[in-house]
Amino acid sequence: MISNRKTLTDYLGYEDSDLRFYEILSDKDNYTIDAGVEIVYQHYRKHGFPYYQIREDEKHKHLRKLQKFNVNTIFKDNQITQTMHALRLCWSYFPHAWSVKCGGAKYTPMDIYISDEKFKSAIRKCWKLFDGISDNTIRKILKIYTNSQAVSNFRPSAAKLIYENFGGDTIWDMSCGWGGRLIGFLASSRPKYIGTEPSSRTFEGLERIKKDFNYLTKTVELHKLGSEVFEPEKDSLDLCFTSPPYFDTEKYSDEETQSFKKYPTEDKWVNGFLYKTIENCYNGLKGNKYMLINIANTPKYKFIEEETVRISKELGFKQEKTIELTLSSVMGTGYKYEPIFVFKK
């Protein structure tokens, strides 16, 4: 328990409710679950959603750590294992990600937070599941709460690995998303990144990443439009690499530029968005260069992988192999893999 409570409240301006919350952070066993849940609930109602926070000086430390990391250590037996390098850095630029509808989930993590009843229930589950209460465990429980799902980010370390092993001077990331591949590029030895992203709020986050790391001797060229619209110069690219939208699985925004809005049926999405994106890659790539696409079937849409391979071969790509990308383990359920299809022009 906090022993100098009067000093902290009278002279340093701490409120008693904050001190009780900090006591729970230190040792929640000093409180009953009912009392603790109410204290934690009131804390987050007062201070807001536990977004990822990172200080300015920390940003550069996170990137330097990824720069120094030997990414070849995470590639074995044709599998890429995940690490957390610079992931918090990525998420700090995209607070709106917590409000994005994902898969067939009924709620977003933000929906759970906004609902008094559901948020208290989530805190209670957090209290029982985890050893301690913190911003991190609250974020975790909001992600896995019943009928809730959060969007995922491509691991920057996995992106760096791909750039170092398949890239050249100029890389096109067709669907930038949450910045994992951009941060991975900034930590790599490659000199030029071209990114396309139609979502306005997500694009703003990407622009902030570019600005924060503009001291690096690299070129970052961002375009606020979809990959099916962007036409790179012929034979100008050394690598095309992305993880595109899985049709309407993640609804990043309600803007009409989103692929699931422009192409609202499976057939239109495959032949309008996916086909045109892969065609733009083929036209932009130099000979003997690679296109890597991380995309997977979903329970609702089982055509995605097959159509990606079909279109790529139809346009002239040769499929060399398929890499397995390790995804997060959810509450002890074991690891899951997604394919990264490797095509060569």
Map each language-model feature to its residues:
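Class I S-adenosyl-L-methionine
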Residues: 299-345
